[in-house]
């Protein structure tokens, strides 16, 4: 922002900053405005905290601009699940990438949570995947009940990644997990570019479960969506675990009982 860069920080006003950013709004770059105003406010907050200025005149500057529209992740309709599983069965992609996509679909986890999954997080005896808070978007630990199908996927990949820290280790960088974009790139190669992204697998699961009238609170708990009420959130995590186990098993059965259910068998044979 050259027009502001030469000004002493105590001379920067909201009106002139808005004027500088208006061309971005006119160009439709609303996400960029959001990022820029956040960065500017971090600087101004630092200046207040260090005594350089008394107040931050730009604190509410984002209200002067149109908010960026929320982008929904590309996903499929439930009726398209059989075709997806068939395409996945015969896709020309690596075995670990194929299972990575299936694991995310079965567990309803986020791409980053799946890509970084560690063997130490898996409790085979309790049939649970315990994801620590630092790996979760909302920085809260999340436990996912594992269906028989997900346990079977673990046995499929164990010979290929059992010696690694990660379920899905990178084949390019030793000691690291696969890129969070690996699944997206594979879906594009499968012909789903512009129709489905890895994060959209969660929406596919959510839509299917809601259509079959599962408890919405149980679905939200499975998706690790935030409940602003801390007590209610803690209660739900404990109370819904067994209900989620039943639901996750139903979801896995739905995935593998589609007319094109050769996916796991194909992986085992190849």
PLM features per residue range, with description:
Residues 137, 148-152, 156-164, 169-175, ...:
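C-terminal secondary-structure termini that scaffold catalytic or DNA-interacting sites
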Residues 31, 49, 102, 106-113, ...:
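C-terminal catalytic core of tyrosine-transesterase DNA break-rejoin enzymes
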Residues 1-27, 43-46:
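Basic/aromatic-enriched alpha-helical hairpins
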Residues 77-82, 126, 145-194, 200, ...:
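Active-site/catalytic core of tyrosine-dependent DNA strand-transfer enzymes
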Residues 55, 121-128, 193-195, 214-236, ...:
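Short, polar N-cap/turn motifs at the start of nucleic acid-interacting alpha helices
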Residues 13, 32-39, 77, 96-97, ...:
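Hydrophobic (often cysteine-bearing) scaffold residues that line and stabilize catalytic clefts
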Residues 26-39, 49, 53-117, 125, ...:
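Basic, Lys/Arg- and aromatic-enriched nucleic-acid-binding interface segment
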């Amino acid at each position: 922002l050259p027009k502001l860069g030469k000004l002493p920080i105590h001379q920067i006003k909201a009106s002139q900053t808005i004027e500088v950013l208006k061309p971005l709004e006119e160009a439709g770059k609303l996400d960029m405005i959001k990022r820029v105003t956040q960065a500017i406010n971090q600087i101004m907050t630092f200046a207040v905290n260090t005594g350089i200025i008394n107040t931050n005149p730009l604190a509410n500057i984002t209200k002067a601009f149109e908010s960026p529209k929320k982008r929904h992740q590309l996903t499929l309709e439930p009726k398209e699940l059989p075709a997806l599983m068939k395409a996945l069965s015969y896709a020309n992609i690596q075995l670990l990438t194929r299972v990575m996509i299936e694991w995310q679909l079965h567990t309803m986890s986020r791409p980053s949570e799946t890509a970084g999954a560690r063997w130490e997080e898996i409790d085979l005896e309790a049939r649970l995947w315990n994801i620590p808070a630092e790996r979760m978007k909302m920085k809260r630990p999340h436990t996912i009940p594992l269906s028989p199908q997900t346990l079977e996927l673990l046995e499929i990949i164990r010979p290929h990644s059992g010696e690694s820290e990660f379920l899905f280790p990178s084949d390019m960088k030793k000691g690291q997990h696969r890129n969070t974009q690996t699944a997206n790139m594979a879906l594009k190669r499968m012909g789903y570019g512009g129709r489905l992204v890895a994060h959209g697998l969660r929406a596919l699961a959510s839509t299917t479960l809601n259509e079959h009238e599962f408890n919405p609170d149980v679905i939200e708990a499975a998706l690790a969506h935030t409940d602003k009420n801390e007590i209610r959130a803690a209660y739900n995590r404990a109370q819904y675990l067994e209900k989620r186990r039943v639901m996750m098993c139903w979801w896995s059965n739905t995935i593998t009982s589609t007319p094109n259910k050769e996916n796991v068998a194909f992986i085992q044979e190849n």
